[in-house]
Structures are given as structure tokens and as C-alpha cells.
């Protein structure tokens, strides 16, 4: 079990990023399962403070401690003392400010930065907008919502994020991802 330090006056996130989600209550003493969206599950604890949104307001979440139980990560939230109180946090997204995230090497991207980018083939065909990403184990996959006037009648495309092979260029400033991809797929 890892004890967490207390946080003093905490500013709400300026650029909120979801790093996980609170799961079901665990036991009767206010513990909860947590589902991490970070590459290494335990890395979620490196990004503090955590916030949840309640009644359209950011609320900081103070972690008292955490531990691994079998395959799950279990957390104890400060001032949550019983199962009933813990259950109220179930399904709350865990948010941190983007400034907490480490800088990436060239050619590496946070999913949050790819969302909303327009995807264009090397031939100039507009495939659509990145609306989601999926992790498949072998590589990440862009979920691209096709343009309304798509000539192929496709509503959604799944494009593997294979740098150099499929992904030819990522221009985050222009929000454009250039791909070598057949528009018919």
C-alpha cells in the first residue's frame, strides 16, 4: 500500500485530460477500483492532483493510498469512509491538467492531441476526422468519422497508426494527419 501526501489549495485543470475512471466500490471501508488509461497502469498515480466533475464544477480528489489487488488497482480516497460513499464515485472520470504529462520525443503523440485532426490521404482525399483511438496490442488504431459527402459511402474508418508505413505526416499545428491509405477501405 502506498500512502499519498496531502495537497493544499489546488487550481482546477486549465487543459483537462482524462487519465482513468473510478470503478466499483471495493469492500466496506470506502475503497474503489480504478481503471487507468495510462500506458503503464500504475503511472496514473504519477499525475497529481486528480479531479472529477460534479455539478459542472471541478472537484479535487485527494488520494489517501493505493494498492494492487490481483489485476486491479484499488484506491482509498480521502474522506470516503464507507462503501455507500465510494459508490457515488463509481464511473467518474479521473482528470488531470495536461501540464502534468511528460514531454514526448519526436514522433510520439498523446491521443488527446490526435483527436479532432483531419485525416487526408497522400493523394489529397479527405477521409474525415479522428473521433477516437483504440489500442489493439500490436498498434494503435485511428477511428475516423468520414465526411458527410464521402464518395465511397463509408461512415467510419479504422486506420492503423503505423508511423512511416501508413502514417506519413502528423501536423498538430494544422490538425492534419497524412496517411497512405486506400479511401475505399
UniProtKB/Swiss-Prot annotation:
Coiled-coil intervals, chain numbering: none
InterPro entries: PRC_barrel-like_sf, PRC_RimM, RimM, RimM_N, RimM_N_sf, Transl_B-barrel_sf
UniProt-recorded Gene Ontology molecular function terms: ribosome binding
Compartments where found: Cytoplasm
Main location: cytoplasm
Domain PRC barrel per the UniProt entry, residue ranges: 106-185
GO cellular component terms, semicolon-separated: cytoplasm; ribosome
Signal peptide segment: none
Single GO BP term: rRNA processing
Keyword Cytoplasm: yes
UniProtKB keywords: Chaperone, Cytoplasm, Ribosome biogenesis, rRNA processing
Keyword Chaperone appears in the UniProt entry: yes
Function according to Swiss-Prot or TrEMBL: An accessory protein needed during the final step in the assembly of 30S ribosomal subunit, possibly for assembly of the head region. Essential for efficient processing of 16S rRNA. May be needed both before and after RbfA during the maturation of 16S rRNA. It has affinity for free ribosomal 30S subunits but not for 70S ribosomes.
Subunit structure: Binds ribosomal protein uS19.
Written domain comment of the UniProt record: The PRC barrel domain binds ribosomal protein uS19.
Family assignment from sequence similarity: Belongs to the RimM family.
PANTHER family for the chain: RIBOSOME MATURATION FACTOR RIMM
HAMAP family: Ribosome_mat_RimM
Name by which UniProt lists this protein: Ribosome maturation factor RimM
UniProt organism field: Sodalis glossinidius (strain morsitans)
Gene from which the chain derives: rimM
Amino acid at each position: 500500500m502506498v500512502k499519498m501526501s496531502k495537497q493544499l489549495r489546488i487550481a482546477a485543470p486549465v487543459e483537462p485530460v482524462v487519465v482513468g475512471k473510478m470503478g466499483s466500490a471495493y469492500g466496506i471501508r470506502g475503497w474503489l477500483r480504478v481503471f487507468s488509461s495510462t500506458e503503464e497502469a500504475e503511472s496514473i498515480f504519477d499525475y497529481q492532483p486528480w479531479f472529477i466533475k460534479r455539478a459542472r464544477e471541478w472537484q479535487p480528489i485527494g488520494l489517501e493510498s493505493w494498492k494492487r489487488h490481483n489485476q486491479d488497482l484499488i484506491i482509498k480516497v480521502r474522506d470516503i469512509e464507507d462503501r455507500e460513499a465510494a459508490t457515488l464515485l463509481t464511473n467518474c472520470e479521473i482528470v488531470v491538467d495536461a501540464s502534468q504529462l511528460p514531454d514526448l520525443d519526436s514522433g510520439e503523440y498523446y491521443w488527446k492531441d490526435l483527436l479532432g485532426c483531419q485525416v487526408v490521404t497522400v493523394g489529397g482525399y479527405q477521409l474525415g476526422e479522428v473521433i477516437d483511438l483504440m489500442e489493439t496490442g500490436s498498434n494503435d488504431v485511428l477511428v475516423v468519422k468520414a465526411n458527410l459527402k464521402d464518395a465511397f459511402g463509408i461512415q467510419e474508418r479504422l486506420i492503423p497508426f503505423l508511423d512511416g508505413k501508413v502514417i506519413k505526416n502528423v501536423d498538430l499545428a494544422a490538425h492534419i494527419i497524412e496517411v497512405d491509405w486506400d479511401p475505399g477501405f
